[in-house]
Curated annotation (Swiss-Prot):
InterPro entries reported in the protein's UniProt record: Etherase_MurQ (IPR005488), Glucokinase_regulatory_CS (IPR005486), MURQ/GCKR (IPR040190), SIS_dom (IPR001347), SIS_dom_sf (IPR046348)
The protein's annotated pathway: Amino-sugar metabolism; N-acetylmuramate degradation
Protein's job: Specifically catalyzes the cleavage of the D-lactyl ether substituent of MurNAc 6-phosphate, producing GlcNAc 6-phosphate and D-lactate.
Residue ranges annotated for the SIS domain, each copy included: 55-218
EC number from the UniProt entry: 4.2.1.126
Catalytic activity as recorded in UniProt: N-acetyl-D-muramate 6-phosphate + H2O = N-acetyl-D-glucosamine 6-phosphate + (R)-lactate
PANTHER family assigned to the protein according to its UniProt record, in alphabetical order: GLUCOKINASE REGULATORY PROTEIN
GO MF entry, a single one: ether hydrolase activity
Protein name in the entry: N-acetylmuramic acid 6-phosphate etherase
Gene: murQ
Keywords assigned: Carbohydrate metabolism, Lyase
Length: 298
């Protein structure tokens, strides 16, 4: 596989003397390069939005968001997946991260795993990929065999497919219903796509999961109302969320949370609509999780 023509593998003309720079100079040039990433992501907001629609529809019908990748790209997808349960109250199987070489490859690289497209098919089959799911393949180069094979297999299973790459005309784009190509250009350190490309992939994943969860009613204003108080930090956060959402006194918020089994959304509906925890839960279910609809559904 010839990668020499890829922009992410090219030499950055602004950093050819990287080893001669002072530490302040080196950090400044890295920061300057990083500042270009947000602009590159902004250029593909339409494609990101289209992917959000696919993901939201999958989650609404009981399907999953499945990230698929190798190396840094796979780790970024896995990182976003594992953050969804504590942030949005999802179950661990609603947002899934598949990493070539398995979970152990997050810490220790599994040599050659990314070059085996059949591994992705096996990994997807192991979790029962179906037409209800959206599979997001991450590959900075746009050519990783594991990701190409995974997207092909997901399509064959009827799943919606999204690709994220950092080169134009990426191979993975051919197998995606929505192709996201964030053109981050040559890296500060030649070929080290854990830098700008990795940052871009993380930004896109942040958008995909967060925007989808907002659409699903897991956010009220800008507050994480589906979070459950499972540790000391979250107990305090959930109490503050209820207070800020309703204007209730902290003691009143605590009483509502106790009745709501620590669930912020239920406590908010209880206080805002003046109803019991059971009635709040019923309202939320009838409203499909949308808190504003639940409050007004008297």
């Amino acid at each position: 596989m010839d990668l020499s023509a890829l922009e992410t593998e090219g030499r950055n003309t602004r950093t050819t003397e990287l080893d001669r720079l002072t530490v302040p100079e080196l950090l400044a040039v890295m920061n300057d390069e990083d500042r270009t990433v947000a602009s590159a992501v902004r250029d593909v907001l339409d494609q990101i939005g289209a992917a959000v629609e696919l993901i939201t529809e999958s989650l609404r019908r009981g399907g999953r968001l499945i990230y698929l990748g190798a190396g840094t790209s796979g780790r970024i997808g896995l990182l976003d997946a594992v953050e969804c349960p504590p942030t949005f109250g999802t179950t661990p199987d609603q947002v899934v991260g598949l990493l070539s070489g398995g979970p152990g490859a997050f810490v220790t690289a599994v040599e050659g795993a990314e070059d085996q497209p059949e591994r992705a098919a096996d990994d997807l089959d192991a979790i029962g990929v179906s037409a209800d799911d959206t599979v997001v393949g991450l590959a900075a180069s746009g050519r990783t065999p594991y990701v190409v094979g995974g997207l092909q297999h997901a399509r064959g299973a009827g799943a919606a497919t999204v690709s994220i790459a950092c080169n134009r005309d990426a191979l993975v784009s051919r197998y995606a219903d929505v192709a996201i190509e964030v053109l981050t250009g040559p890296e500060v350190l030649t070929g080290s796509t854990r830098l700008k490309a990795g940052t871009a992939e993380k930004m896109v994943c942040n958008m995909l999961s967060t925007a989808s969860m907002v659409r699903l009613g897991k956010v009220y204003g800008n507050l994480m109302v589906d979070v459950r108080a499972t540790n000391g930090k979250l107990v305090d956060r959930v109490r503050r969320i209820v207070v800020e959402s309703t204007g209730a006194e902290p003691e009143t918020a605590e009483q509502a949370l106790a009745a709501a089994d620590g669930h912020a959304k239920t406590a908010i509906v209880m206080l805002a609509a003046g109803c019991s925890a059971d009635e709040a839960a019923r309202r939320i279910e009838r409203a499909g999780g949308d808190i504003r609809t639940a409050i007004g559904a008297g």
